[in-house]
Design a protein with these regions (language model features):
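Short, low-complexity N-terminal leaders and the immediately following helix N-cap/first helix
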Residues: 1-69
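Short, glycine/charged-enriched hinge/interface segments at domain edges or termini
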Residues: 55-175
């Protein structure tokens, strides 16, 4: 057998000190043990956004819409993924919107394009959509200031992606 004191000494020698930290680029951090808590620096998504391709609109304008009773709206703009518009949607207006685009002012929902005639200047809506339906809120996935990764976790590809999405270029890891 081995004496208790010697066993403790061997264990202590083999354990890396949490104080023995180095900073490395995130590209070299996979598989390493994180030496600090990783905190969200921004909200994700960073703004209210559309989860699908369709038309951003006011739900009150399409109450009662159906295939037999389509409601026609004026298309006033188009917003691509990651884009935005300064236009505000008014009564009986809509903006064509792609997945990931910022929800325009005045809109409280998005209708999927498959529930429309895909119109460019005017669009026929074939279905009701409720308030905040198909609507992703700012910070819905990650809230600024929340802890994303705990000190002592082994970093995987997933962790590295999260760290990168927060704008970190380097992280502290245990040597």
């Amino acid at each position: 057998g081995i004496e208790l004191e010697l066993a403790i000494e061997l264990i202590c020698d083999s354990v890396k000190s949490i104080n023995d930290i180095e900073e490395v680029s995130i590209e070299k951090a996979r598989g390493r043990i994180i030496g600090e808590d990783i905190i969200a620096t921004i909200n994700q998504p960073p703004f209210d956004r559309s989860p699908l391709d369709g038309y951003a609109l006011r739900s009150e304008d399409i109450t009662g819409a159906s295939k037999k009773n389509p409601i026609k709206l004026k298309v006033i703009d188009e917003v691509c993924a990651g884009g935005y518009t300064h236009k505000e949607v008014g009564k009986n207006e809509t903006i064509r919107i792609m997945t990931g685009a910022k929800i325009p002012k005045g809109c409280d929902c998005v209708i999927r394009q498959e529930s429309t005639d895909y119109g460019m200047e005017t669009v026929e809506i074939y279905q009701e959509v409720k308030h905040h339906q198909n609507y992703c809120f700012e910070g819905e996935d990650i809230t600024k200031g929340s802890k994303l990764i705990n000190l002592g976790e082994k970093l995987s590809y997933i962790h590295i992606g999260i760290i990168a999405s927060m704008g970190y270029e380097k992280v502290k890891v245990i040597r």
